[in-house]
Amino acid sequence: MPFLGQDWRSPGQNWVKTADGWKRFLDEKSGSFVSDLSSYCNKEVYNKENLFNSLNYDVAAKKRKKDMLNSKTKTQYFHQEKWIYVHKGSTKERHGYCTLGEAFNRLDFSTAILDSRRFNYVVRLLELIAKSQLTSLSGIAQKNFMNILEKVVLKVLEDQQNIRLIRELLQTLYTSLCTLVQRVGKSVLVGNINMWVYRMETILHWQQQLNNIQITRPAFKGLTFTDLPLCLQLNIMQRLSDGRDLVSLGQAAPDLHVLSEDRLLWKKLCQYHFSERQIRKRLILSDKGQLDWKKMYFKLVRCYPRKEQYGDTLQLCKHCHILSWKGTDHPCTANNPESCSVSLSPQDFINLFKF
């Protein structure tokens, strides 16, 4: 009777015992045997070559299909949890460490840009990454970075808000990429050089779209900003944290120009962003012998960083070392999780992953 070989190297074919020893059973219906061992070996080699070529073809086809899908997709890699555990070293329970790219993929920045409280925070974070941390991201994180940036540009084109902020972000990114592309071959960027050249052309196209944007007047015919009392207008202008916004607002109407030159307004703006010591080092007098707070502000901006304030920020739980957005639930074992959370500025977020 036929015997099935148990050798793990056997291809699983049948063997029968004859007077001359064990021989391979070729065709059960005809009952013929393989007597010529060389012919069998040649056939086996032929079958293996066909199998190998078939596998190579399947793998290549799957890879082309995967690359095509990856090149067309515009969505961020999605994770169900909106938090990430930040660990900087290996332990018995957890090996490896958390990287900036991993945190960037997990914290759902695509949804965060739709929230007006988080928009400026995300844009500032994108700017810091574009300046110095782009090479720290993995290939997937770099792709997510460009996808999120595209969503930011589309949102600005639709809402017609924060145009100058995104212009500066795109210019910063383009300048960084010009430097990094010239160093190709030194493992500074992940991906093909042609892909990064295409991305740079896309950035130039976005810049052109932002430069050509036309602000449309709303159809609303009700009360406008200039119809408000002067004291209320001045109170609203004091809420602006960027001096360039005050200058732009003053160019909108002659009455607003007078308010935008108010010395007390610029004095409070200087005191908000800079310390008394910094202000004393950059005193500027006007022709009338008074402090020119407007000129002092723009000089201080060139010398010192401005104070950053955001409506919503990322928070780090000191108890469980979990990073998440404010108001996002995370598995914390502390009795009072809110007291353990510390707000992180965009720069603090970057520094968190410097080892």
Swiss-Prot record:
Motif (Bipartite nuclear localization signal) on chain: 280-295
Pathway involvement of the protein, from the record: Protein modification; protein ubiquitination
Subunit structure: Part of the SCF (SKP1-CUL1-F-box) E3 ubiquitin-protein ligase complex SCF(FBXO32) formed of CUL1, SKP1, RBX1 and FBXO32.
Repressor recorded as keyword: no
Keyword 4Fe-4S: no
Pathological condition linked to this protein in its record: Defects in FBXO32 are associated with susceptibility to dilated cardiomyopathy (DCM). A disorder characterized by ventricular and impaired systolic function, resulting in heart failure and arrhythmia. Patient are at risk of premature death.
UniProt entry keywords in alphabetical sequence: Cytoplasm, Disease variant, Nucleus, Ubl conjugation pathway
Protein purpose: Substrate recognition component of a SCF (SKP1-CUL1-F-box protein) E3 ubiquitin-protein ligase complex which mediates the ubiquitination and subsequent proteasomal degradation of target proteins. Probably recognizes and binds to phosphorylated target proteins during skeletal muscle atrophy. Recognizes TERF1.
Effect on the protein upon substituting L169Q: Significantly increases nuclear localization
GO CC aspect terms: cytoplasm; cytosol; nucleoplasm; nucleus; SCF ubiquitin ligase complex; Z disc
Tissues in which the UniProt entry reports expression: Specifically expressed in cardiac and skeletal muscle.
Protein name: F-box only protein 32
Domain of life the protein comes from: Eukaryota
Record SUPFAM superfamilies: F-box domain
Signal sequence range: none
Organism: Homo sapiens (Human)
Domain annotation F-box: ranges: 223-271
Location in or out of the cell: Cytoplasm; Nucleus
Main location: cytoplasm
